[in-house]
A protein has these predicted regions:
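Sec-dependent N-terminal signal peptides
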Residues: 1-23
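Enrichment for repetitive, rod-forming helical segments
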Residues: 9-10, 26, 51-52, 124
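A general, composition-driven signal for non-globular sequence regions
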Residues: 13, 38-39, 94
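Bacterial extracytoplasmic/cell-wall-associated proteins, especially those involved in peptidoglycan
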Residues: 22, 54, 59, 64-217
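N-terminal propeptides/low-complexity segments immediately following signal peptides
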Residues: 24-45
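Long Lys/Arg-rich low-complexity intrinsically disordered regions in nucleic-acid-associated proteins
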Residues: 43-54
Length: 217
């Protein structure tokens, strides 16, 4: 009897103490690896948003997970000196150099023109190419790209505003204040081409236009 009782006790102890340790899966790395973070990941997001915005007739905003948030946008090109090779940087620098020192609504209107051109017939399908268009002939659509000066942003606050506007534009969260304009000039300028286009609106120091027949030239 005593031997039977001892054997039973040993069996119970083994059942309790010999169980394999449970794995805490919450501490294990994901099978797909950690989520990508940092400016490079944000630039990839921006590329996808750019393609979405360039799609003809696509006005539907992306899902929240696809959108760029404020910290992500500000982490890209923090010193305003990175190469112009991604959508956020190209758009933000254009906003900055075309309208720095002007009101926020003026800066937003410049972003509107870039986004209106994106994917429009007669214009490229990426923001950087939209901004650079014409530089091969020395006649850039956006003058800052061809002026021969440094492209580095020098005013932190103004450039931070430009990046925030670029973020909203890529997220399709920016109201088009220009009435679909594809062209603009400063109010004090009198370019010869202006008479060929229909003026849509004046915003601050800028006048905005679009083709009378709807086609870009």
């Amino acid at each position: 009897m005593r031997q039977t009782w001892v054997a039973a006790c040993v069996a119970i102890v083994c059942l309790i103490g010999c169980r394999p340790a449970e794995v805490d899966h919450s501490q294990q790395p994901s099978a797909t690896g950690p989520a990508a973070t940092g400016p490079a990941a944000t630039e990839k997001k921006a590329e996808a948003l750019e393609q979405n915005a360039a799609a003809a007739g696509n006005k539907a905003p992306p899902s929240p997970s696809e959108m760029i948030n404020k910290p992500e946008a500000q982490a890209v090109d923090p010193a305003g000196a990175e190469p112009l090779d991604d959508a956020i940087t190209c758009l933000a620098r254009t906003i900055y150099w075309e309208a720095r020192g002007e009101a926020t609504v003026d800066m937003e209107a410049i972003a509107n023109v870039v986004m209106n051109r994106l994917g429009h017939e007669g214009f490229p399908n990426t923001i950087c190419d939209v901004v650079r268009q014409g530089h091969e002939q020395g006649s850039c659509q956006f003058s800052w790209w061809c002026d021969g000066r440094s492209d580095q942003a020098k005013e932190d606050e103004s450039y931070a505003t430009a990046k925030e506007i670029a973020r909203k534009a890529l997220n399709l969260q920016l109201t088009d204040r220009t009435g679909g304009a594809l062209y603009f000039h400063q109010r004090r300028a009198t370019p010869g081409w202006a008479a060929e286009y229909a003026k849509t609106v004046q915003i601050g120091e800028f006048l905005f236009y679009k083709p009378r027949g709807g086609e870009a030239r």
